[in-house]
A protein has these predicted regions:
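Flexible, low-complexity linker and terminal segments
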Residues: 1-166
Length: 166
């Protein structure tokens, strides 16, 4: 995991230090050394990079023309919209992310497999922007709605249907 040994607070003969200041990689003492800071930043990133997350799973039509992508509390509405689209004769699938950092290892492979990918977010598109930074050559459509309310399935179906027609 890359985690260092921690003395359990109260263990006799051990000193326990907590706080937000940068520590020396060698001693654990507070350090303002730029090289140490660089090394500790790389160490923290390696811990994140080594987290094992499951592969991304796609639900819906395996031969979909449109992949709908979401995360968080949008799952039910997006799945309902994808199911309705498939029932209406469209070919749609859903990839709902549970892990964003690190991303599932198969993220780029999944997103690049589909003719069209739409990222549905209840914000201004931070996830789509993140993927554009992380995945070279990715082409994404966006559905962004910031109303403080859940997505309306009918709105999603209408938007996704028009997107397939383009």
């Amino acid at each position: 995991t890359g985690a260092r040994y921690w003395a359990v607070p109260g263990t006799e003969g051990f000193m326990h230090r907590i706080g937000g200041l940068e520590k020396s990689a060698a001693t654990g003492a507070i350090s303002n050394d730029p090289e140490n800071h660089h090394q500790m930043t790389l160490t923290r990133q390696a811990k994140v990079d080594n987290i094992k997350v499951p592969d991304l799973v796609v639900e819906g039509n395996p031969d979909a023309d449109l992949l709908v992508v979401g995360f968080g509390g949008t799952y039910g509405h997006l799945l309902s919209a994808v199911n309705e689209m498939n029932a209406n004769g469209n070919k749609a699938a859903l990839a709902h992310f549970k892990y964003l950092n690190p991303l599932p290892k198969n993220t780029a492979e999944v997103l690049k497999k589909y003719k069209k990918v739409v990222v549905a977010e209840q914000n201004l598109g931070q996830l789509a922007a993140y993927w554009r930074m992380k995945i070279e050559g990715i082409k994404l459509e966006q559905f962004n709605e910031v109303k403080g309310q859940p997505f309306a399935t009918s709105t999603l179906v209408n938007y996704f249907t028009e997107l397939i027609k383009k």
